[in-house]
């Protein structure tokens, strides 16, 4: 037999198990081919021997599974001469017992029974042998893949685990393996009190050099003991375990920072309540030349309303749509000489400035707090909006002529220039008290010099806290005009309310109340479509819609202020105005037929007890019957167009 290198054949039995005839067994193996069977030894009892190298005899931890140079004794010989009990050193089962056809040097091939599974001495792959009757399942385990346990790396790592576990448990008194595996990487409030109430030393010095710590998985050691200094944060109450900042870049998804909620910070400035058309109007109105390119409009919006600094880019598309589709803006020629489309300027349409200014004031009145919150410099709001009375028309109602206080039929006031149809107003009739103003109670003692400029401003601060007081005392079923306190006059009305019936009877006591304030309700008239779709904001048809609504509010048929019954919805043809005198009752028109007159309280179908006020501000004023014993008061007319109707 050809001798082999020493490193490949160094597996022998330990010293005490080495027998005296072992040297002779080695010498009796004559040289021959590697695949030829070795002759049987004369000493059958010394068959546990194997190849011996020239070096010192020592045992190695494991061998390759397909080594062709190792001779192993038969199971029956090992049973007889190598006891199964504990000895000075464990005996390892050679893989030649399971792989006989790979050139192993064994005894004669005439004894195949040695390789059967029915042997009486199964061996553990790397521990001492066990008997079949004690561990019957050991045979099946060895027959599957015994070589999987014979590599040096896994064996050494596996045998070192109990030592590290014992040391780790000394520093983790209240934690189990499940708590370490499931608790710390994903902290939550659902852990038991044992985990939450323990003081834990996350990185003890002994565990820093361990190889297989925490759940016995060496790759997980970076989750708890990183090479960088730990940055632990403890809660003030001390009732929870620390949450580590992990230094390894391989576990970015496991970083649990307590202030993680502040990373997605809320925007400091909310979205402004102004529509894009109003924001463009503000930018153009506050420009030096009155015209700006699109880029300057963007800069104005981001400077004064920081919301647009972080808003999606879709808001720029909305700005461009408003500029091109809204008639309030027009493209002007760039006088600097640039004729490209990018250099064009945008300016305000002079015919639409009044409408845009009123729209701007309306939004300021609607929610001034929200407007200022969305601005970078809230103190600049008034300067950006500008003077309300700038370039606006004259007040709606002028002062009555001096001769109006004399006796004679009531004449409607002359409308302002540019308004063809007569406007409806509230006029005092000639009464027995020449110096008495019938609206004095309404104005709480303030005697106005011009009815068209002074009105009552219904606000919670000015309105009396008690029940509404009668404005015009009426006798015998006559009607009582009441104003409901506590309802602010500036509150927006529903957007579907028709603006054509907007004969405003109440207004604030300031001459700044202008034509647009009186004619137009405070509700949204459809000029702002941002709530529907930003891409559909302020299209071309809105300019015509505004003009149509404004014309409808001025050019109407005679406004129906009084209807006698639900079945009659229109007034008869104009009749000569009746004249009432204090001694007798006033004759009032009824809906039974044209020209029919009936005394109040006569019991007809058109009695004044059924009268209703059908104006836009029916929410502010209503007519109710009063007891017949009420004292008589001055006569006041509500005059639709040229036909006054006597109420008292």
From Swiss-Prot:
Record InterPro entries: FH_FOXN1 (IPR047401), Fork_head_dom (IPR001766), FOXN1_4 (IPR049624), TF_fork_head_CS_2 (IPR030456), WH-like_DNA-bd_sf (IPR036388), WH_DNA-bd_sf (IPR036390)
Keyword DNA-binding among UniProt keywords: yes
Keyword terms: Developmental protein, Differentiation, Disease variant, DNA-binding, Hypotrichosis, Nucleus, Transcription, Transcription regulation
Stretches for region Disordered: 1-105, 392-445, 458-508, 623-648
Keyword Membrane: no
Effect of residue 430 to S: Does not affect transcriptional activity as shown by a transcriptional reporter assay
Single GO term (MF): DNA-binding transcription factor activity, RNA polymerase II-specific
GO BP terms: animal organ morphogenesis; blood vessel morphogenesis; defense response; epidermis development; hair follicle development; keratinocyte differentiation; lymphoid lineage cell migration into thymus; nail development
Tissue: Expressed in thymus.
Implicated disorder: T-cell immunodeficiency, congenital alopecia, and nail dystrophy: A disorder characterized by the association of congenital alopecia, severe T-cell immunodeficiency, and ridging and pitting of all nails. T-cell lymphopenia, infantile, with or without nail dystrophy, autosomal dominant: An autosomal dominant disorder characterized by decreased numbers of T cells, particularly cytotoxic CD8+ T cells, and increased susceptibility to recurrent infections, mainly respiratory viral infections. Additional features may include impaired thymic development, skin abnormalities, such as atopic dermatitis, and nail dystrophy.
The protein, known as: Forkhead box protein N1
């Amino acid at each position: 037999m050809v001798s082999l290198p020493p490193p490949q054949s160094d597996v022998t039995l330990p010293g005490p198990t080495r027998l005296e005839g072992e040297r002779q067994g080695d010498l009796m193996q004559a040289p021959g081919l590697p695949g030829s069977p070795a002759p049987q030894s004369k000493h059958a009892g010394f068959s546990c021997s194997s190849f011996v190298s020239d070096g010192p005899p020592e045992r190695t931890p494991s061998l390759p599974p397909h080594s062709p140079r190792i001779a192993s004794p038969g199971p029956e010989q090992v049973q007889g001469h190598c006891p199964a009990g504990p000895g000075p050193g464990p005996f390892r089962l050679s893989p030649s017992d399971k792989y006989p056809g790979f050139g192993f040097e064994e005894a004669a091939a005439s004894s195949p029974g040695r390789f059967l599974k029915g042997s009486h001495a199964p061996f553990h792959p790397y521990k001492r042998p066990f008997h079949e009757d004690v561990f019957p399942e050991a045979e099946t385990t060895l027959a599957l893949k015994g070589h999987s346990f014979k590599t040096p790396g896994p064996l050494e790592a596996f045998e070192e685990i109990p030592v590290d576990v014992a040391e780790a448990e000394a520093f983790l008194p209240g934690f189990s393996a499940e708590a370490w595996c499931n608790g710390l990487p994903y902290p939550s409030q659902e852990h038991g009190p044992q985990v939450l109430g323990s003081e834990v030393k996350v990185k003890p010095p002994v565990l820093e050099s361990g190889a297989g710590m925490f759940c016995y998985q060496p790759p997980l050691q970076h989750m708890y003991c990183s090479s960088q200094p730990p940055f632990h944060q403890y809660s003030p109450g001390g009732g929870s375990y620390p949450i580590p900042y992990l230094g390894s870049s391989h576990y970015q998804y496991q970083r649990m920072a307590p202030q993680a909620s502040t990373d997605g910070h809320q925007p400091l400035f909310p979205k402004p309540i102004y529509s894009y058309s109003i924001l463009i109007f503000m930018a153009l109105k506050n420009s030096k030349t009155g015209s700006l390119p699109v880029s300057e409009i963007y800069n104005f919006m981001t400077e004064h309303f920081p919301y647009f600094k972080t808003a999606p880019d879709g808001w720029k598309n909305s700005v461009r749509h408003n500029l091109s589709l809204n008639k309030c803006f027009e493209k002007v020629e760039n006088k600097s000489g640039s004729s490209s489309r990018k250099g064009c300027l945008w300016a305000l349409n002079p015919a639409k400035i009044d409408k845009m200014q009123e729209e701007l004031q309306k939004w300021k009145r609607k929610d001034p707090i929200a407007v200022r919150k969305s601005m970078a410099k809230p103190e600049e709001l008034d300067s950006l909006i500008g003077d309300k009375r700038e370039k606006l028309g004259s007040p709606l109602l002028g002062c009555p002529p001096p001769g109006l206080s004399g006796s004679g039929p009531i004449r409607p006031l002359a409308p302002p220039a540019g308004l063809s149809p007569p406007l409806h107003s509230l006029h005092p009739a000639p009464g027995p008290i020449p110096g008495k103003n019938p609206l004095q109670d309404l104005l709480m003692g303030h005697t106005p010099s011009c009815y068209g400029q002074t009105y009552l401003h219904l606000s919670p601060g000015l309105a009396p806290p008690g029940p509404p007081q009668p404005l015009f005392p009426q006798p015998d079923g006559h009607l009582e005009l009441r104003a409901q306190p506590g309802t602010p006059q500036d509150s927006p009305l529903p957007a579907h309310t028709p603006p054509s019936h907007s004969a405003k009877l109440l207004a604030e006591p300031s001459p700044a109340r202008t034509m647009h304030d009186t004619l137009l309700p405070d509700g949204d008239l459809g000029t702002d479509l941002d709530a529907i779709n930003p891409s559909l904001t302020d299209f071309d048809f809105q300019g015509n819609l505004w003009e149509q609504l404004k014309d409808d509010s001025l050019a109407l048929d005679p406004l129906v202020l009084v209807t006698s019954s639900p079945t009659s919805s229109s007034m008869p043809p104009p009749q000569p105005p009746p004249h009432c005198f204090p001694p007798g009752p006033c004759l009032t028109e009824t809906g039974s037929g044209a020209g029919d007159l009936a005394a109040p309280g006569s019991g007809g179908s058109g009695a004044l007890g059924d009268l209703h006020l059908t104006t836009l501000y029916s929410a502010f004023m209503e007519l109710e019957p009063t007891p017949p014993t009420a004292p008589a008061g001055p006569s006041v007319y509500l005059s639709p167009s040229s036909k006054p109707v006597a109420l008292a």
